[in-house]
Amino acid sequence: MTKKVAIILANEFEDIEYSSPKEALENAGFNTVVIGDTANSEVFGKHGEKVTVDVGIAEAKPEDYDALLIPGGFSPDHLRGDTEGRYGTFAKYFTKNDVPTFAICHGPQILIDTDDLKGRTLTAVLNVRKDLSNAGAHVVDESVVVDNNIVTSRVPDDLDDFNREIVKQLQ
């Protein structure tokens, strides 16, 4: 059975941090499913990429997926603003159950809401690192960091390393 990767996404995502990992995963034979506020709605990247949401967060069941991808940009901030905290709850399933969880740039912000970062080693874009540290994570400045089931990366320049590692984690 082909593995499925959930991608949680909102407006103002960093286009390349969505499209590049998605392409790498699909080229490796994995299915990707975009999860957002409402199925069949559209979300737009910071540079104009338009993406149709496949499954609404209210209908999404984390146990249906083999991994979670959280692209950066301002999308994670919008997702954290969900008044019901559904995206943090969704991500918590992955972190608590040792299911592969991939986050780049601002993406690790969502992981703060899982309350599962204490003692974890992560990286992220510079202006998110203090928040991760305050949540109990050990933060390093490396292109890609693997801590058990969580893979994090900093910026678009790190995408080659990030993509290689997330595909490796699922093979």
Swiss-Prot record:
InterPro entries per record: C56_PfpI-like (IPR006286), Class_I_gatase-like (IPR029062), DJ-1/PfpI (IPR002818)
Source organism of this protein record: Staphylococcus aureus (strain MRSA252)
Gene3D superfamilies associated with the record: 3.40.50.880
Full protein name: Uncharacterized protein SAR1965
Family: Belongs to the peptidase C56 family.
Domain PfpI endopeptidase: 3-171
Pfam families, per database record: DJ-1_PfpI
SUPFAM superfamilies, sorted: Class I glutamine amidotransferase-like
Segment forming the signal sequence: none
